[in-house]
Amino acid sequence: MAGRSELVVSFGEMLIDFVPTVAGVSLAEAPAFVKAPGGAPANVAIAVARLGGGAAFVGKLGDDEFGRMLAAILRDNGVDDGGVVFDAGARTALAFVTLRADGEREFMFYRNPSADMLLTHAELNVELIKRAAVFHYGSISLIAEPCRSAHLRAMEIAKEAGALLSYDPNLREALWPSREEARTKILSIWDQADIVKVSEVELEFLTGIDSVEDDVVMKLWRPTMKLLLVTLGDQGCKYYARDFRGAVPSYKVQQVDTTGAGDAFVGALLRRIVQDPSSLQDQKKLEEAIKFANACGAITATKKGAIPSLPTEVEVLKLMESA
């Protein structure tokens, strides 16, 4: 990685979330909705940029009002949108997201097909991908062709150019034809990632075991990995590297909306790793990076909406110092 840029390139979907104006109601009961930009890979890119890092996004949007708005949001937040293409024949994806009374979320998606699913490998901005120090992606882009092939090709290009590959499956069961296909396709690219982050729910989904004990987590470990993380919400996270493992507690905050908290965590961690790649081999440095990421995720959960809640470095350090 010596001499490489600190650019984090994020690949995948960006969409509009419609969130009820009132928490704790079903979609049918919601009196009104507010629109919020979303999509995990885009959230990660903006999280990196908000923290002062170099970030770019690669994906496809509809050539419509919402698509143009989302591209402008990337630019306004300091994210390079040179990898964004527009589809005149398909709409930008929409998701209706219910915030339950406990701040957790339920989803209903409108994608049949949406523009992000139609990205082809010929539309990839190869030069941008080759500049990545870290290439980050989820699994939603694996669901359907032609986006799946574009995703696999983008991973190859990034890997060949020397990037670290970062994978957050970001499971959305409702989007997959079946649980079995979701599990198979999510795991189909598992061995290629250097850094993998899963939630407690994803750990159970992928292993079939409702436990966060080390022996269960290690079922997802691969010798090719540099870092495996399991996020435990307000309990912090567990981490597994080649030569060490451990747990880092979270910061206690008043949760309002967990949307984007995991993406904020990932963005903050990747920001720290590109600043000092040796943290992947140094337990003390890695724990400091994870503390920073935990603080970033915690702050994001204290406000409504993902992108508006993503903190600056000053805000993150302030929380860390006050804890």
Swiss-Prot record:
Q: What name does this protein carry?
A: Fructokinase-1
The family annotation for this protein states: Belongs to the carbohydrate kinase PfkB family.
PANTHER family, alphabetically?
A: FRUCTOKINASE-4-RELATED, HEXOKINASE FAMILY MEMBER
What activity regulation does UniProt give?
Completely inhibited at 50 mM ATP, but not inhibited at high fructose concentration.
**Classification via CDD domains:** bac_FRK
Reactions listed under catalytic activity: D-fructose + ATP = D-fructose 6-phosphate + ADP + H(+)
What is the species of this protein? Oryza sativa subsp. japonica
- Keyword Transferase assigned to the entry: answer is yes
Q: In which pathway does it act?
A: Glycan biosynthesis; starch biosynthesis
- Supply the alphabetized keyword list: ATP-binding, Carbohydrate metabolism, Kinase, Nucleotide-binding, Transferase
InterPro entries per UniProt: Carboh/pur_kinase_PfkB_CS (IPR002173), PfkB_Carbo_kinase (IPR050306), PfkB_dom (IPR011611), Ribo/fructo_kinase (IPR002139), Ribokinase-like (IPR029056)
